[in-house]
Amino acid sequence: MKVVGIHGILHDYLTAPQIENEWLLALQGGLEVAGNPRIERNEFTCVGYGDFFRPSGTRSGYTPSLSYTDIEGEWEEELLLKWWHEAATLSAKNRSGEDELGENGTIQDPEFQGRGRIPEIAQRALKQLSKSKYFKAWGSEKVLIFALKQVRRYLYDKELKDKILQRVTEKVTQETRVIIGHSLGSVVAYEALCANPQWNVHTLVTLGSPLGIQNLIFDALTPTPENGQGVWPNVEQWFNIADKGDIVALEKELAPHFGSVTDLLVYNGWESHDVKRYLTAKETGCAVATGIFE
């Protein structure tokens, strides 16, 4: 396959073929908008790994019953606070009502709320994030907490990480020229490329990536960054594409952390982290085309 896509969080009940159908149409559109030919179905595949997070013995669509009391340890608290702070920053920018598709203007800043014990902080954070247009699209607060835990599990559960990376290895071939990673999938894509320098992949495209979040994600990567610099994956080009309102992609620019990354901003409206909106962007079409056609 010329192009391999790797999805992000909250795909517990979707398999690779389902995700491929969704991604392919959007990617074909992005390529056309950028003035390039479409790729065909037999040139594209997706890596599915959401089933590893699916609770066993439960009905489809079930998310574990989670609340603010289930936020565990400093890592989960800190990422939750970073999401809250970013949502509040975007809220403050939009209080003039200039952008109807921008963030809710009533989200209070964490500093306004004060600090306290983890359960208290988590409860306040979830209350404010429930106002966010982005997180509201996820549904209930238990879904947000479940997503938070998926990120931590991937980073720190070696057995789980190895299984997910094996799924990537099974999809990448000598013909693979481009890997696209969205959200947590960008972390998976990066680590898979670093672990397999023999691959013939030309271009990495990261969409809505959390790779640059210091201390929590960047510093937990494999291989470990040194002196504030991440290891360059074995690719010729790396395009990092983010919406300025994407709360998950807290660090919009990855070049300061990894070197010769081409950082690009796009506008996805209020669905700032939505993968289809990223894939249909002209910038994404151009980035993918450089790996396929040049």
Can you say where each PLM-predicted feature lies in the sequence?
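Lipid deacylating catalytic domains
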Residues: 1-64, 105-180, 184-294
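N-terminal accessory alpha/beta regions
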Residues: 41-105
